[in-house]
Amino acid sequence: MASSSKALIESIGSLDKDSYVSLLSKLIGESKFVQNNPPELIPQEDLIVKHVLDSLRPYSTETGGGPLVINHVAYHSGRGNLIVEYPGSVPGKILSFVGMHMDVVTANPDDWEFDPFSLSIDGDKLRGRGTTDCLGHVALVTELMKKLGQAKPALKSTVVAVFIASEENSSIPGVGVDMLVKDKLLDKLKSGPLYWIDTADKQPCVGTGGMIPWKLQFTGKLFHSGLAHKAINAMELAMEGLKEIQARFYRDFPPHPQEEVYGFATPSTMKPTQWCYPAGGINQIPGECTVSGDVRLTPFYDVKEVITKLQEYVDDINGNIERLETRGPVSKYVLPDENLRGRLTLSFDEASAGVACNLDSPGFHVLCKATEEVVGHVKPYSITGTLPLIRDLQDEGFDVQTSGYGLMATYHAKNEYCLLTDMCQGFDVFIRIISQLEQV
């Protein structure tokens, strides 16, 4: 390690555990009010902003106590974003930590072993809703910017932190990072790596999946189950129709060679997750049912192409429904005497594309080196979970890399927690990223 890099790391030091836990306790204490599930639960992210500002204002240009430049930007009342900048000396040389969102998913206290809306400590475990996703990261990056404001290291790079509103639910548009990008408030971040801090397990996450939510309605003919030859069984139509659609999907979108390069845990998948049918007696063959599910698509396939293909499958099945496999000697999907044919109807909700991070980016190599130095090993991974906001950033020209220091096992889960030692390592990774980019 170069002496200047080592000196920078030593000047900033490690995470102040007491300060971190104190701040996180305040944030988790607000988590009940930043649950994001409209229309019932609309988060008030400014409750989180207040605590972050209380930590950083003493080291800001606003108070004259330090170099931090703070910009609180709100597009909806009570739902602010926060941009915090530590200025460097070289124009255009910049790195950023983005994605630390100030809303959380819902939690039912009756289902938890401890109060989700107050921080509790069990050894190394810091427990509560948002500790892993993502208030733990809000507190961590706040402590990073606070340390920079206190130590005032002479950096060539400008370091920017962007705390965002409205990540967990997009049903209310125009609140968070999408608006910051639209208003060009983040444009200068395109000059350097943008680290999206909202994943888990201390390793670079280099790929995420796209998502295509779909719904298939199956229409047959309801009839008495003792006269099965007079019915078109919508459930059987659903089972066989969906089986055929899945077979065609996996034929046309097989595992992609790049998935191994990126370490994806799974290839693209198309599967049902919900089944709905009208209530009726057990002696009634149903005339309709609905199956819903999703496609999880690795970023090496095009979302629009998949949507087109799925519709083609359905159109072909409808046009040749006599060829679809049946179940038993009287099972059928056509009643010629009644001029009735079974029918599939496909619809989609809003789709999003996946992300493949740039593995040739200096920002990626710096993240890997810092992770190896601190954690002891580096193993980038990819999942077909979705982070649509970072795909939008990538499409806008940002060099997005992702990492996080919570636990994947507790992400969106009951009894959520993170580990203080993991967050300490995350802080050390951040400092090494900054120090290494000083040498680039």
Swiss-Prot record:
InterPro entries: Bact_exopeptidase_dim_dom, Peptidase_M20, Peptidase_M20_dimer, Peptidase_M20A
Single Gene Ontology MF annotation: acetylornithine deacetylase activity
Subunit structure: Homodimer.
Active site per the UniProt annotation: D103, E167 (proton acceptor)
Keywords, comma-separated and alphabetical: Amino-acid biosynthesis, Arginine biosynthesis, Cobalt, Hydrolase, Metal-binding, Zinc
Hydrolase recorded as keyword: yes
Gene Ontology BP terms: L-arginine biosynthetic process
SUPFAM superfamilies named among the record's database cross-references: Bacterial exopeptidase dimerisation domain, Zn-dependent exopeptidases
Binding site for Zn(2+) 1: H101, D133
UniProt cofactor note: Binds 2 Zn(2+) or Co(2+) ions per subunit.
Reaction it catalyzes: N(2)-acetyl-L-ornithine + H2O = L-ornithine + acetate
UniProt EC number: 3.5.1.16
Annotated metabolic or biological route of this protein: Amino-acid biosynthesis; L-arginine biosynthesis; L-ornithine from N(2)-acetyl-L-ornithine (linear): step 1/1
Homology family: Belongs to the peptidase M20A family. ArgE subfamily.
Protein name as annotated: Acetylornithine deacetylase
Sequence positions that bind Zn(2+) 2: D133, E168, H412
Cofactor list: Zn(2+); Co(2+)
UniProt xrefs under Pfam families: M20_dimer, Peptidase_M20
